[in-house]
């Protein structure tokens, strides 16, 4: 065969295929050789960290001033940089070396004499491997720093270059002392920094977020109260004093870390901690503003201010880990109108607080506030002079409660309380009742109490003297040792709807006897009315006592309900749909006298679907009618100690009374109805 093989391929195809196979084999061989060359010619990945050690100063050395820290660092390749640390803080980075030695010049600014610190160096190579030296310990010499004591009588600046500044003993600041950002001030045990003792003085300490000013104890092992604190005294300059981004710690031996009695000090973005007393204490004109400051570890109240300085308390303060995380209010009388804002922490009131002055001050408590009262302390409004209290918790319940495990004396509204500007709305009042007091007491003034819960009191819930309420609605009174409410008969009608009085030791509203001279309507409540004295309805105004359907009145022994005895009066008791009950405080015949309808009782008087029970204590029946002609229908009159009905000087027909009413269980030896002349 010529030109083509038996399969039809040409000679050209046959030879060219062989050539291609040879070329492919050569390329594979070449690639393998190149790979071997690369593997043999490239070094391995660098994963070895440098070796590094500090060679100066020596472990245990004392440092008295600027010091050169030397570290020797080696690596299998090269060290790129060295990082120097004091304790956990980086103080510098060095990228050049003399051979294998890296040096950093360190000034121990802010390091207090007598303290001990750890030095460490990290060496980093080009691959990012990081090697650490063993730490060495150095001691700061007691000769380090700038020392101060005595009196500063001219303006002075404490620079960061001369830091730390050491206060060796009491220091009187009688001019403006400026402290630069980053300065550390160490104070000797028992020493005080007093500002404005004799002449105007001030402290301007405007630290920064990244350059805090620290005022601390020089003692290397300090505790709360090691030094006394900073005191702005009576002659402190009235402007210019500021503590911003400052740390004040381990003081309080003088009562507080910072005490402001004058000077209108501004405190902002500080840290106050480890006090043996309070954190900040302010009185008089001592404080202009306090905001964004953290208080912790205070053995006393972290913030304590006079009543007139509450407005100086701004936003952003935090109270954590103190003996009591609350703001102490110091003083006895609110003499100017003020608003207490909700700062996120309770107000602690350690003595009785009075709101009263000739200027008629109004104390407004913001929604969400909590006012905590010490044992036997009270909140009194309008004592001797006008005053008002507004506590509207519509957008956040306001709490009035006990500060500790004991009881406080509660809220007292006195006769000169301003009723137009006094109201409790959506409040909680609890833990009161010290010395038998009520949670709320009203003396001859009608205030508004609505949507409020009064609970857990050692005394009564609400006690009124010669007064009722402007409004008393949707309130809950529960958990009281005593009755939920004491009120005179004349003012029962001021008790509104929607109230709950259940769950008290005495399960009834206590009604004090007396004369009803104006129209009154007794509304149905969820507990009975317990009447403790005779109630007489009558006056020149011809008052009507209206009893709502379903009302229950329980009368103490020897008491009665009299209508029209000496002056015109009227009783309207229509028990539709639910009957009205007049009964004794105990289920014994003769417990109370009964209802007496005298000659001045209006002919419009009605008793319909009422129950008159366990009366007759005056031997005149449960229902005594003398000279009047009331309407009596569908009543139950029973369990008398004598007669059920006693008629005298009236045209009422006994048989008609028997037919239209149910008389039963009168005493043996008596008739159901006695008919006199």
List each language-model region with its residue ranges:
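N-terminal compositionally biased, intrinsically disordered segments and leader/signal-like regions
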Residues: 3, 32, 68-69, 75, ...
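Low-complexity proline/serine/threonine-rich segments in eukaryotic and viral proteins
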Residues: 16, 27-36
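Beta-strand/loop edge motif enriched in small/polar residues
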Residues: 43, 142-677
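Secretory-pathway ectodomains
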Residues: 2-13, 18-20, 71, 84, ...
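C-terminal motif of bacterial Sec signal peptides marking the signal peptidase cleavage site
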Residues: 39-41
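Long, low-complexity serine/threonine/glycine- and acidic-rich segments characteristic of extracellular
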Residues: 44-142
């Amino acid at each position: 065969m010529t030109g083509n093989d038996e399969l039809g391929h040409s000679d050209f195809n046959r030879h060219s295929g062989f050539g291609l196979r040879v070329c492919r084999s050569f390329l594979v061989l070449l690639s393998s050789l190149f790979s071997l060359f690369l593997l043999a010619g490239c070094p391995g990945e660098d994963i070895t960290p440098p070796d590094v050690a500090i060679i100066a100063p020596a472990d245990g050395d004392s440092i008295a001033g600027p010091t050169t820290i030397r570290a020797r660092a080696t690596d299998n390749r090269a060290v790129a940089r060295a990082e120097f640390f004091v304790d956990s803080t980086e103080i510098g980075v060095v990228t050049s070396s003399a051979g294998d030695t890296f040096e950093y010049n360190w000034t121990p600014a802010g390091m207090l004499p007598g303290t001990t610190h750890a030095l460490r160096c990290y060496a980093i190579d080009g691959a990012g491997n990081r090697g650490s030296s063993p730490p060495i310990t150095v001691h700061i010499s007691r000769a380090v720093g700038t020392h101060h004591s005595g009196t500063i009588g001219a303006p002075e600046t404490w620079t960061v270059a001369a830091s730390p500044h050491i206060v060796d003993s009491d220091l009187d600041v009688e001019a403006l002392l400026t402290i630069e950002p980053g300065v550390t001030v160490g104070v000797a045990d028992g020493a005080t920094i007093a500002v404005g003792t004799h002449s105007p003085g001030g402290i301007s300490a405007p630290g920064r977020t990244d350059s805090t000013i620290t005022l601390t104890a020089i003692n290397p092992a300090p505790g709360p109260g090691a030094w006394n604190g900073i005191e702005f005294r009576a002659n402190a300059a009235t402007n210019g004093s500021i503590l911003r981004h400052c740390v004040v710690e381990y003081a309080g031996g003088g009562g507080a870390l910072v005490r402001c009695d004058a000077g209108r000090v501004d405190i902002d973005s500080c840290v106050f901690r480890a006090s043996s007393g309070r954190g900040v204490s302010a009185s008089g004109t001592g404080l202009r503003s306090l905001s964004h400051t953290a208080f912790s570890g205070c053995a006393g109240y972290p913030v304590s201010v006079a009543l007139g300085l509450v407005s100086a308390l701004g936003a952003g303060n935090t109270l954590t880990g103190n003996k009591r995380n609350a703001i102490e209010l110091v003083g006895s009388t609110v003499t100017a109108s003020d608003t207490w804002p909700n700062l996120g922490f309770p107000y602690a009131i350690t003595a009785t607080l009075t709101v009263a002055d000739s200027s008629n001050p109004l104390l407004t408590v913001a929604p969400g506030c909590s006012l905590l009262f010490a044992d036997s302390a009270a909140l009194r409004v309008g004592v001797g002079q006008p005053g008002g209290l507004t506590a509207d918790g519509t957008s956040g319940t306001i709490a009035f409660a006990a500060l500790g495990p004991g009881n406080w004396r509660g809220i007292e509204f006195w006769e000169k309380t301003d009723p137009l500007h006094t109201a409790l709305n959506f409040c909680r009042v609890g833990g009161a009742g010290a010395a038998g007091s009520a949670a709320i007491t009203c003396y001859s003034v009608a205030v508004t109490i609505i949507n409020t819960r009064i609970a857990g009191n050692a005394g009564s819930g609400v006690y009124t003297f010669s007064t009722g309420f402007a409004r008393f609605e949707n309130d809950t009174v529960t958990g009281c040792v005593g009755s939920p409410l004491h009120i005179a008969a004349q003012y029962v009608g001021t008790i509104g709807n929607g109230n709950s009085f259940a769950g008290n030791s005495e399960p009834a509203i206590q009604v004090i006897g007396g004369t009803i001279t104006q129209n009154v309507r007794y509304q149905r409540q969820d507990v009975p009315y317990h009447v403790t004295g005779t109630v007489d309805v009558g006056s020149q105004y011809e008052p009507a006592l209206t009893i709502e359907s379903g009302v229950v009145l329980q009368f103490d022994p020897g008491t009665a309900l009299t209508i029209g005895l000496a002056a015109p009066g009227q009783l309207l008791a229509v028990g539709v749909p639910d009957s009205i009950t007049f009964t004794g405080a105990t289920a014994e015949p003769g417990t109370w006298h009964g209802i007496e309808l005298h000659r001045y009782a209006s002919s419009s008087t009605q008793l319909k679907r009422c129950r008159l029970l366990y009366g007759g204590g005056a031997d005149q029946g449960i229902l005594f009618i003398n000279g009047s002609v009331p309407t009596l229908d569908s009543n139950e009159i029973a369990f008398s100690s004598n007669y059920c009905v006693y008629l005298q000087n009236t045209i009422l027909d006994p048989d008609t009374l028997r037919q239209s009413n149910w008389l039963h269980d009168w005493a043996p030896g008596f008739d159901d109805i006695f008919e006199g002349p």
